[in-house]
Amino acid sequence: MYKGIAGSEGIGIGNVVIIEEHEIVIENKKITDTDAEIARLQGAIEKFVNDTNAMADRMEKTVGAKDADILRGHIQMLQDPTIEEQITALIVSEKITAEKALDQVLEQTAEIFAQIPDELLQQRATDFRDIKARILKILLGIEDYDISAAPAGTVLVAHDLTPSMTAGIVAENIAGILTEVGGRTSHSAILARAMEIPAVLSIDGICTSVKNGDRVVLNGTSGEAIVNPDAETEQKFAGLLEEYKKEKELLKKFAGVPTVSADGTKVELVCNIGKPEDAKKAVECDGEGIGLFRTEFLFMDRDTTPTEEEQFEAYKSVAETMKGKPVIIRTLDIGGDKEIPYLGLEKEDNPFLGYRAIRFCLQRTDIYNTQLRALVRASAFGRIKIMVPLVTGVDELRSVKAMVADIMKELDAEGIAYNKNLEIGIMMETPAACMMADVLAKEAAFFSIGTNDLTGYTMAVDRGNSKVAYLYSAFNPAVLRAIKRIIECGKKEGIMVGMCGEAAADPKLIPLLLAFGLDEFSVSATSVLKTRKTIADSSMAECKALADRVMACATEAEVQAVLAQQ
């Protein structure tokens, strides 16, 4: 059995087709005609843009505009004028080929993003390498395997499935996907989920462990795959596939109903989004609001910071789309670890612990004040709440509240409407915030637990480092105690406590969160109905009894053993 990351839920049974990567050899030679080389580069870029637009159009017809925009985003990334300028300058100054110059510039850019301790932003490294590989293949005349020709019952196996590869997939022919790299936030996972194809990612060495035609069964929910299973195992997976199909039908009855436990405890079930247009998906999937709107993506892939008006329109559009439902908007979570050229930030040795999020914002008040003004103005159009990331003490919260108070005075003088009862809360994601939760709860309007970073900081682990990734788990007793303390401190002061990390949708963790008293679960739009069903199947009495046993555990293994008995 092979174990990896559960990238896209579901059961798959089929035959292996390996997507082999062509070796790209770049000659290290000098050129004499730089104009001709620049023309080659521009021709390749033009073909790349045309091909990408065509792929995005096809993808839009099959999985929708939201996922097709991942590919269109590649065009925007490449059209950053500084990138082509750097490549052209290298061709002219170093007298090197278009291939060599392109490789150097895009690999340097990719490496910057790869060092960012944020899974969503690390994905940009994969994007830039996909762009680089595709343009290099155009320049070198290399053609890839046509995924659209894969026969029915195919399990695709690849080092990674880039957005451009995924665009060619005919969903009904693909039984599953296995890759050597990638996580739940990688584009291969996002697109697999959009096409409802089960996927297991980050299986080390899978490409060399299987051969074309091998029979594979996989469980994208548990992150497991078995190559050439015996008849009994394949029959078992066939049964699981039928059960999965029935469960999907069953989930439909959880649309349009409140999120309530089996014995009547009501909680809010809201969605995480990264772009204004994602709010429509949240509505379509029956989300009860927005629990996390990541605003940093408004600041990326451009040459200047977004204006107040640009931000105002983005926040307003989400508020209006949600029609009076709560919308929690996280202020800028960006800093020295992000390659945003116009910010002029220095690269840091340890950006995970560095100049980022609220630390950056309180020093760059010119940028932060603009964002806060846009947020306060947009609050007139819906139930917007402001959330401050990476807080470690009450002084940071007080500084933000003081800035907002000053902005409100300005808007009063200008005669501009806003919500005078605008709530300002905290992203609880550091051990410092956890230890100070009793103090912070007295001054914050709400808490939202960011389990991804809280787990990393609490366990002192970089989940991107395979040697220590085993330590990264929300089921570790230390992390569970941190979560429980934050919720208890919030409840004592009567404020709402939510969770917007991946753990909020984990069916094994949900009963514990209910027992702890979590008020709000913020999940991906596609996880709404499944999470609602898990909550509906849970009784508070049973959840509390389970939590008592779990909180008596000393190790993660003990926690998992208790949960396995349920």
Labelled PLM ranges:
Residues 248-566:
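Conserved alpha/beta-domain cores
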Residues 1-321, 327-334, 364, 368-372, ...:
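Non-catalytic, soluble scaffold/interaction modules
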